[in-house]
């Protein structure tokens, strides 16, 4: 079987039923590590379709309100990605407060704890909270992005 990796960036949708991995986690355009590109590079040659919420055309001037069409589209795309993905990787950047990532972890803990893998490094200001949520809901954890990707089945 020929393996292929495909990346889909927000706000495009998956057109067919493929094995998907949603990349939830720190973005903070310009400050957080672009870990999504590292994940995509590590997944080259695999059969996974990557749902990447980091988008090249993001505009930080968009009002983060439900009435803002672009913002609504982005958040809706992310929620649908989490809901429908076969796996979710949740990555916390130790230098980011990552409030949306904390919310994404909460969603995953209720919707798909068995299909979620969390990377939360030492030094993340809420690591204790993240560790307790992962322990309570039996969410898999990994020390590195490489380890998380190797755990995808």
What are these regions (language model features)?
Residues 1-153:
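Conserved catalytic or regulatory cores that recognize and/or transform ribose-phosphate-containing ligands
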């Amino acid at each position: 079987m020929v393996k292929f990796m495909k990346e889909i960036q927000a706000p495009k949708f998956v057109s067919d039923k493929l094995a998907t991995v949603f990349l939830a986690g720190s973005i903070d355009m310009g400050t957080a590590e672009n870990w999504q590109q590292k994940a995509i590079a590590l997944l080259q040659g695999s059969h996974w379709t990557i749902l990447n919420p980091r988008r090249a055309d993001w505009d930080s001037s968009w009002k983060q309100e439900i009435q803002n069409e672009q913002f609504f589209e982005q958040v809706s795309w992310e929620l649908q990605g989490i809901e429908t993905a076969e796996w979710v990787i949740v990555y916390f950047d130790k230098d980011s407060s990552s409030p949306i990532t904390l919310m994404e972890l909460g969603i995953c803990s209720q919707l798909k704890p068995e299909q979620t893998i969390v990377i939360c490094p030492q030094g993340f200001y809420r690591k204790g909270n993240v560790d307790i949520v992962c322990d309570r809901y039996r969410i898999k954890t990994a020390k590195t992005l490489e380890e998380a990707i190797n755990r995808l089945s």
